[in-house]
Every structure is written in structure tokens, then in C-alpha cells.
Amino acid sequence: GVKVWAQRLSYVGELGFELYVDSSLAKDLYEILIEEGKNFELSHCGMHAMDIMRMESGFVHWGHDISPEENQYQAGLKFAISYKKNVNFIGKDALLKIKDQKLDKRMMMFTLKDSKPGEPLLLHEEPIYMDNKIIGRTTSGNYSFCYEKNLSFGYVNSGNTVETLKDKNIYIEIEKQKYPVEVLEKPLNNKDFKN
């Protein structure tokens, strides 16, 4: 037997578990899971599949969508902050200072209106335009085969909200060509992740 610490959480927006095991036993556990998983049609999943699944669910990625340059309020992660308990945590004082300040940028989700698999290739750092003015930059991009759409995350300047951008001409520039996008109000996969 292999002693495993299982956490019910998922980076991809589906019911899942992260398994923690002593590294010397990881190969044994992997082989057990693959063998037993045959009865449940278990299959391997690649990095790009995991990446688009987390994007479909609106999950941000450290290093792409959030970094030391952004804070939880800008990234739409206010729900993850609680000041109710008398508990100190790293960054609490900095967050309290900006808690009531106006955001200078905010994270949004976009889909290209004309989507083809992998075309254009969305990565990150593509400019986001309203008409001919740059209003932000993308942070992640990928093609969703489940929803048949190119999906992108990005930050837009202060004053822009889903409501204010909804009826505007919004574009993402990829390889010097502008592609019209739709601003999403909620993730494509908007399951209740609490159950």
C-alpha cells in the first residue's frame, strides 16, 4: 500500500483530487492508478488540455494571469480574501491599504467571434483594443474544443467593465491583425464548484 494525502480540489474545473505522496512511492502509485483506472476508462491528459479546461472554468494561472504586478482585487479574486477573522497573513496590510481604492485595471474573459481551432494562435501579451485605442493586454489564450471558441484572459484599464464594453468594438491584435471579441460575463463552464 501507498500512504496518500488526497485533497478534493481541481485546477481544471471538474471534480478532482490532488494526490500527495512520498516521492519515492510516486511511480508505484502512478502504476496502480493507471492499472486500476482501466476499469473507469482513465486516460492521460496533456498540459494544453488542462490549460484550456481551467480557462473554461475561469481559473487564473500564477505567472500568466496573476503575478506580483497584480493584486487579488484586479484579478477578480476578492472572494478569496477575508478580513473577518483576527488572523494575520502575508500581504494583509498591503491589501487593507488598497481595499477601497478604485481599480486601475481588471481581469476579463474574452472569446474571439470567429473561432477556428488554433487559428489564430492566442498566447499572451496581445494588445486589447476598443476601436483604435489599446485598453489592455491578454494574459492567457487557448482554443476550447468543448465550446468551439478561442478563449482569452486579459487585463483592461480602469473604467472598463463587462457592462461598458458589451456593445463596443473590442479587438485582440494577433500577429498584426485585429480579431473582434466578445466580452464574457461569466466563464464558459460556470458550474457550482462548491458541491
Per-region residue spans from a language model:
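Conserved, structured C-terminal
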Residues: 1-195
